[in-house]
Amino acid sequence: MSNNKLLTDEQKELYSLMLPIYGAMVKQNNTAKILNTSIATLYRMRKQGIGASYKKLESNSKNGTVVYPLQEIVRYITESNVKTA
């Protein structure tokens, strides 16, 4: 896991629910669905240095393949929540 941060109990529960559906590494199209956004928005977020952490895998394409570790998506979803009273 990135930054050696452990998942909270809430994050572990969400991760365990999503893992059988999406796998440990999530492609951009599924990440966009999970975050209810577009692939273009994910691209802009990466360029701005915001959003979930991602990995760029080497491939035959000139730009490589971008994937998102599921634990980073879970962390992003839960840590970007605003707590209300």
Which positions does each model-derived feature cover?
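A detector for short, charged/polar N-terminal pre-domain segments
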Residues: M1-G23
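Generic detector of low-complexity/intrinsically disordered segments
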Residues: T8-D9, T37, R44, E72
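A short, Lys/Arg-enriched interface patch at domain edges and termini
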Residues: S2-N3, L70-A85
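Intrinsically disordered, low-complexity segments enriched in glycine/proline and serine/threonine
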Residues: E13, G49-I50, R75, V82
